[in-house]
Amino acid sequence: MKKILLLFICIFWSTIFQAQSLKLEEIMKGNDFIGNLPENERWSLDGSTIYFDWNPNKEWGNLTYYWKKGMKAPQKASKEEARFSKIRFVEKEGSGIYYYIDKGQLYSYAIKDKKSKKLFQHSVPVSNLQIGKEEGVVYFKQSDNLFKFDTKLGSLVQLTNFKKGKSEEKQKEKESFLKEQQKELFQFVRDQEQKEKWNTANDDAKSDFPKPYFFGKNSIESTKASPKGDFVTFRLREEAEVKQEEMELFITADGYNKFRDTKTKVSTNNFVNTKMGIYNVAKDTVYMVNFSSLSHIQDVPDYFKLYEKNKNLDKKDKLIVAQAPIYNQDGSYAIVEIRSQDNKDRWLVNLNLATGSFKEIEHQHDEAWIGGPGIPSYAFSSGTLGFLADNETIYFQSEITGYSHLYTYNLRTNKKVQLTQGNWEVRGVVLSKDKKTFYLTTNTTHPGNREWYKMNVSDAILQPILTNDGAHEVSLSPDEKTLLVRYSYKNKPWELYWATNKKGSSLNQITFSTTAAFQEYNWRSPEVITFKAQDGTPVNARLYTPNRNQANKAAVIFVHGAGYLQNAHNHWSTYHREYMFHNLLTDLGYTVLDIDYRGSDGYGRDVRTGIYRFMGGKDLSDQIDGKNFLVQNYGVDPNRVGIYGGSYGGFITLMGMLTTPKEFAAGAALRSVTDWAHYNHGYTGNILNFPETDPDAYKKSSPIYFANNLEGNLLMLHGMVDDNVEYKDVVRLSQRFIELGKKKWSLASFPVESHGFKETYSWVDEYGRILDLFNSTLLNK
C-alpha cells in the first residue's frame, strides 16, 4: 500500500512539475524559445562546403553559416562568401564554367581557378539567363528583348525587337481632293513621289537588325531561346482591368493612416487572353501557335449542367496558359505544358517551332481541379517535366491512378510508361547529371513520412536510402556522392545532417539548434492514429492524451490551415507554437486531436479534391467524426469539446459553430475566411469554381450565410493588417451578428499583425484568450 501511495505521489508531482514548466509567455516566443532552425541549405559549386542560413545567437535575422567535413561546428561566413553562396548558377555540362547574374550584370566563374569574370555590364539589368548549345554561348533578357552573347568571341547580338504599343510606321494618308489636285498640277510633286518609291525599292543599306514586333497593350513574358538560338518563344498576356482590394494600416511611423493594395477577388473577370508566339530568327518573322485543336478544349465542366443559364451556351475554346518549352539537349524537341484557366485540364504537346504546329502527347482532366505533387495547381504555374539521357524521352507526373506518380513518354515510339505505383505519392523528383537515375522524395512507408529513394531509369526499382520515420529534405552534392539532409521528427525540430548517398546510410548531425529551455521539457511524440469517417474514408490525425489521473474529459480539436496542407505527419510541424500549446493543454488534462481532414495534402487525389464545391462539407464532418472517435474511445464528454484553428482552420471553426451548432461548446476562429467570394482567385477558383458561374457553391461554403445559427461560445481573432484574409472578413461577419442580435461572440483585433503574427506579445495575447475560452467553457460543467 505504501509503495502504491509513493508511486501516486511521484506521478502527481511529476505531472504538476511538467504542467508548470510550460508557460504561454515562453512557448509563444516560437523559435526564440525553441531555437532558430537552419534553413535554405545549399552546396558550394565544388561540393566542398555546405552553406545555410541560421541564427543561433538570436540576432535580428538569419546569417549565412558554412560547414566542411572535419569541422567541429559551423562557422559564420563572410558577407562576400554569404552573398556568393546564394547566387543561381548555370553551367554548360562538363565545361567547368558557370555563368550567373549578380545585380543585373553577367559574370562567369571558373571552377578550376575559382575566379569570377565580369562579362557584360549595362545600365539596364539583364535577367533570364540561359545556356546555349554552342560552347560559350549564353542568352539573356534585357527589358523585353532577348540577346545572344558569345563569351569566346565577345560578340553580342540582339535576337528580338519586341516593342510595346502600336507600330511607328507612318499611317497611310487619306486621299484628298487637294492632294490629288497637287499631283495633277505640278510636275515637281509627281517627281518627288516617284523618287521616294525608287529609293525605298533600291535601298542597298538595308539593315539585318530584326524588324520590330509590336505587342500592343499586352505584357510579354516567358521569353526563351531555343538551344541553337534559331527560335525565340514568348507569351502575350492581356492586361486585365480588375479592381484590387485595399487594406488600411492604422499604426504608422508618421501617425497618418495608409492604404495598401492586397489582392484581386475570385472572379471570371480575372480570366485573361494569352497567346504563345514564336519568332523565327532566320526569317525575321513572328507567328502565333493555334491551340484550338487540343482535345477537349471546348468541353464545359459538369457543374455547368446544374444551372439553367449554362445549358445552351455556344461552344468556344477554353482560355489556357502555355508555358515556355522544355528542350532536349540539341533543341530538336520542344515540349510545352498547358493548363486551362477553368482549372480542369492539362496538356503536354510537342511543338514544331518551324511551323507553329504541335502534336498532343498527354491530356489530363480532373472534374474538380488539376493539381497534386509535381502537377501545376494554378494556370500560370508548371509541373515536373524534363528529358532523359536519350534526348527523346520526357518524364512528368500524373494523378491518373489517384496518386501522383512518375511517368515517361518516348517521343519517337509514342510509348508511355508508369515508373512508380502504389497508394502513395512522389513528392519530389531529382534527375542525376547523367540523366539515367532518379532520386525521389516519397511518402511510401507512411503518408506522414518524407523518404529518399534512388531509382534507375532502366529498371524503375526503388532503392531505399533514407526511410526512417520523419522527414528528409535532401540536397544532392555536385558529385552526387553525399547528401545534405534537413531532418526532423514529430518532437525533434529541423537540424542539418550529412550522409553518404547509399543504402543504409546513417545521418551525421551538423547543427544543434534547440535552446536549453526547450530541451528541459519532455515533448510528446503524438500518436498518428487513423479513424473512419462517416463515409468510410480513413482519416489520419495526431492524438495527444493526458495521463489518466489528470484527464478532465474535455477535448480540443485543432484544424490546420491552408486546406491543402498536412499536419498529422511524423516530422516537425510548421505549426510549432500550436504543437507546444497542445502539450500545454494536455498537461492541463485536455485530450487534443489534430486532424488531416478532407482537402489535406499527402493522401492522393480523392482526399485532395474531397472539398470540391463544398468547403465546410466533408472537411467539417471529419472534425465531427474525430470528436465522436474521442467520445467513444477516450472518455471525452461530448458536451465539453472545443474547436479552433487559423485561416482555413478558422473557417472550419466558424462552419462548425454556425452549421452544426450543437457539436462544439466553444470555438476560437483565427484569421478566418467568412465569405469565399472575397478571397483570392487562384486558390478559391480551383475549389469552388467562380461566383459568377457557380454561386451555389459559394453560398453553401461561406460562414456569413449561417450567422443566425450561432449558439456556442465563439471567439474571433484577426490581424488588422492581414493582406491574405482581410480584416474586413471578420468585420462583415461581426455586423451580421450584431444585426441578428447574437450575444455569445467576441472579437479580438490585433492592429499591427498580418496573416502570420510576428510579435510575441500578440501571440501571447491571442493564445491567452483561446486558453481562457476553453477553460471557462469546457471545464467545470
Question: What is the meaning of each model-derived region?
Answer:
Residues 12, 16, 56, 88, ...:
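Prokaryotic Sec-type signal peptides and long signal-anchor helices
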Residues 117, 157, 287, 359, ...:
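Structural signal for short hydrophobic segments within the conserved structured cores
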Residues 1-23:
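Bacterial Sec-dependent N-terminal signal peptides
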Residues 471-781:
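Serine-hydrolase catalytic core recognition
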Residues 19-462, 469-470, 481-482, 490-494, ...:
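Beta-propeller folds
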Residues 8, 160, 184, 362-365, ...:
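Compositionally biased, intrinsically disordered low-complexity segments enriched
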